[in-house]
Amino acid sequence: MARSVVVSLFVLLALAGLEAIQHAPKIQVYSRHPAENGKPNFLNSYVSGFHPSDIEVDLLKNGKKIEKVEHSDLSFSKDWSFYLLYYTEFTPNEKDEYACRVSHVTFQTPKTVKWDRTM
């Protein structure tokens, strides 16, 4: 009897430990089509591989939050990590800088990844 209680307790603790595993998000920022100045496009930020699911993602233009942004539903992979796609319409030019800023429990401060128009 005591042995089964100990085994049950061990199993419960092991399962509780799975919830505590944290994975930092991978952040990819790219345009839907090759960038051409003055030509409308879509700016995408794919954030993947993170756990837990609580996350804040902002697309930025010249360091300021872009308000009209859409995103996919929160989804998870086979390994139970999460992923999201954030996107917005934009028209690239030579002077504006675009980026994605992500806040997650695995980061001490928000992480910002700039869009590289050559990618």
From Swiss-Prot:
Residue ranges occupied by any Ig-like C1-type domain in the UniProt entry: 25-114
InterPro entries, sorted: B2Microglobulin, Ig-like_dom, Ig-like_dom_sf, Ig-like_fold, Ig/MHC_CS, Ig_C1-set, MHC/Immunoglobulin
Signal sequence bounds: 1-20
Stored CDD domains: IgC1_beta2m
Family: Belongs to the beta-2-microglobulin family.
PANTHER family: BETA-2-MICROGLOBULIN, MHC CLASS II-RELATED
Subunit structure: Heterodimer of an alpha chain and a beta chain. Beta-2-microglobulin is the beta-chain of major histocompatibility complex class I molecules.
UniProt-recorded name of the protein: Beta-2-microglobulin
Record lineage: Eukaryota, Metazoa, Chordata, Craniata, Vertebrata
